[in-house]
Swiss-Prot record:
Keywords: Aminoacyl-tRNA synthetase, ATP-binding, Cytoplasm, Ligase, Nucleotide-binding, Protein biosynthesis
Tree of life domain: Bacteria
Gene3D superfamilies: Anticodon-binding domain, Bira Bifunctional Protein, Domain 2
Family the entry assigns: Belongs to the class-II aminoacyl-tRNA synthetase family.
Recorded GO CC terms: cytoplasm
Keyword Lipoprotein: no
NCBIfam families for the chain: hisS (TIGR00442)
Name the record gives this protein: Histidine--tRNA ligase
Principal cellular location given in the protein's record: cytoplasm
Amino acid sequence: MSNKIQAIRGMNDLLPEQSPVWQYFERQIQHLMQRYGYNEIRTPILEQTALFKRSIGEVTDIVEKEMYTFEDRNGDSLTLRPEGTASCVRAALENGLLYNQTQRLWYQGPMFRHERPQKGRYRQFHQVGVEAYGMLGPDIDFEMILLSARLWDALGLMPHVRLELNSLGSSEARAAYRDALVAYFEAHAEVLDEDSRRRLTSNPLRILDSKNPDMAEMLEAAPRLMDHLDDESRAHFEQLTAMLDAAGIDYVINPRLVRGLDYYSRTVFEWTTQALGSQGTVCAGGRYDGLVEQLGGKPTPGVGFAMGVERLILLLETLDLVPEAARSRPDVYLTAMGDTASREAMLLGEHLRDALPEMHLQVHCGGGSFKSQIKKADKSGARIALMLGDDEIASGSVGIKFLREDREQESVAREALAARLQALLAED
């Protein structure tokens, strides 16, 4: 039996061949957030369990079944964060970020849920979250959707995703709708599965999220939340859809879109795709105007969304939308034959990095034959191998070998090498 220690199920290593694609995605995010005036916030991965029970809701699947919760040595109940919004609100309140001011914040990092691992979904997964506080109108909801749409454009994903919208209304409207929904489900109790019967008393709106095909027809005929909206929420939603129409952003109103977290109110939205099978949501969010007060602050409107990084990278790779330039590999691999050449190669490498800061250069270490070094240069993916040996040192030159083209080798004077490489790398 092997005594190797392996990664925990559902918690994966991000290997060197994968990380350049993540870095490409993260660069797109950082650039976009700067353009829209959002500031990054970083919160701990561990929080008091009470934070999530109070915000997400004690009778949600996340709190009941999925959280990683334990007691520390002081007997305090701690939880690995299952999502980022509650932590963001907690940090903003604790540090006075919401006092008489608006805030636009974003974050990225690992989240943890004890779910069944499946394609693109893991127990440790990464999210990018975007949150805005202190703005009550539909214009900030619109900005959230515009921001996410601009990201899809930048990544080439816009033709492959669909925006779904709904409004959950005010808490009073939801209470009235809840009563109508419970009455309807009780009248169709024989169709409900065991999970839905349990939710009937705790969280009946979540029954609408069921994927049970035996319940599909009954759910399709269920009362619609849109028919129970208060006037203010209806006006808010109509203004939002008018803005989307004016911007030319297509959307579908999905009356069964309720979101899995208790803190949402009014606008909720999801971006979905058909390209990843049945688990098609890649980004989701909405308003949570009561959450700040729920966590001990003054009444403060909030809206935000989160996207799963693993899901989006899987989507990019499935659709072959990762630019070749995003897959990191050296432009140039510098080989060195002999001890003197090895020392000289290190110094030459530093000189070239100073002269050509955008060039990716890898210097061979560890010796070996000329053949083995060229083989490693080729395997690295570099376009060009530089060759430095005793003869080149004596003549003050460097050999250039083209690894991806059928071209004659060149010999270039050391002082002209940077200029020659710059010209070669500029070629298509």
